[in-house]
């Protein structure tokens, strides 16, 4: 599937995603500010309750499918026969042709470092070790600078209200699918679900996240088959270790002319003037949300 720049982008004007709340500022003056909405969404797979997630509520179909894929509850070759979303009961039901029963698996889960109750199941690591990422993909430094600029300038819930994470599927220097949510694992699951539902290939893509480069983020990126992960935030030690194990290119602290690559550095092509990129960042840089995290 061919995607254009920002095929999907945040919609800060959507009244369902933020609320206006009155309060006082540091000087005691009355103010009104936007705050991000958070609501429960209970996911069912073929009638079996899987999990209740806290989410902003957009793209529930993508979130549900991405979650199931990244938890190895939905196979890549599974035929999805239906996705039913009920906004009144805050539920989403994914139906597949294959019969499923994950009662035993649901009893064995690990809380992750992601906010909004992220979980990981034991067999995720087993499949992680079997993934082979394409080695011939390249990451030009000019793409890192271009992506950071475009993503930072894109209107978003982060800039409108804060308290949000963003994940962006990119190709070369073009941002394609930009998802946000209160938990970074929700945002990455939304992208994974969108890719699966729309038949988007992964081997030539770059994954950009605003969140930390944790083990969870590395595992999910590898599971999706994406060979490059970029963030403006920092790393965790286990995230770096897993990225090196999987030959995932891991780039963090990507701000202005600066970044650090701690894994998969053989894919880097240094083709940009870092000083020039820094000047661009000063002229077009992200100013932060109205209520920055």
Regions found by a protein language model. Name each.
Residues 280-293:
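Long, low-complexity, intrinsically disordered segments
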Residues 87-91, 138, 212, 252-258, ...:
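A general structural signal for short secondary-structure boundary/capping elements
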Residues 64, 69-70, 74-75, 116, ...:
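Generic, ordered loop/turn and secondary-structure boundary motif
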Residues 185-273:
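Feature captures the catalytic cores and cofactor-binding loops of soluble hydro-lyases/lyases
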Residues 70-72, 80-82, 91, 120-123, ...:
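Short, surface-exposed, polar/charged, turn-prone segments marking secondary-structure boundaries
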Residues 98-109, 179-186, 223-233, 276-279:
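Short, Lys/Arg-enriched charge-dense amphipathic segments
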Residues 148-210, 216:
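A mid-sequence, solvent-exposed acidic-amphipathic segment
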Residues 2-171, 176-178:
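Intrinsically disordered, low-complexity regions enriched in acidic/Ser/Thr/Pro/Gln residues
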């Amino acid at each position: 599937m061919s995607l254009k720049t920002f095929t999907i982008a945040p919609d800060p004007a959507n009244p369902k995603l933020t609320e206006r709340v009155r309060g006082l500022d540091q000087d005691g003056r009355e103010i009104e500010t936007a705050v991000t909405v958070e609501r429960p969404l209970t996911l069912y797979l073929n009638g079996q309750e899987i999990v209740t997630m806290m989410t902003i509520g957009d793209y529930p179909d993508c979130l549900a499918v991405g979650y199931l894929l990244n938890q190895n509850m939905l196979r890549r070759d599974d035929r999805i026969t239906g996705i039913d979303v009920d906004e009144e009961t805050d539920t989403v039901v994914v139906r597949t042709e294959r019969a499923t029963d994950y009662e035993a698996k649901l009893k064995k889960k690990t809380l992750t470092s992601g906010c909004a109750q992220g979980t990981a199941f034991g067999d995720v690591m087993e499949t992680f070790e079997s993934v082979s990422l394409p080695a011939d993909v390249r990451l030009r430094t000019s793409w890192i600078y271009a992506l950071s600029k475009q993503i930072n300038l894109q209107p978003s819930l982060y800039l409108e209200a804060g308290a949000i994470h963003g994940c962006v599927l990119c190709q070369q220097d073009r941002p394609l699918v930009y998802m946000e949510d209160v938990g970074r694992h929700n945002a990455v699951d939304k992208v994974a679900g969108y890719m699966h539902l729309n038949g988007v290939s992964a081997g030539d893509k770059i994954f950009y996240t605003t969140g930390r480069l944790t083990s969870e983020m590395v595992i999910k990126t590898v599971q999706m088959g994406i060979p490059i992960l970029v963030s403006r935030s920092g790393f965790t030690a286990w995230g770096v270790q897993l990225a090196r194990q999987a030959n995932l290119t891991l780039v963090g602290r990507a701000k202005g002319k600066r970044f650090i690559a701690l894994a998969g550095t053989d894919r880097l092509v240094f083709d940009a003037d870092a000083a020039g990129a820094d000047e661009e960042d000063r002229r077009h840089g992200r100013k932060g949300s109205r209520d920055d995290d």
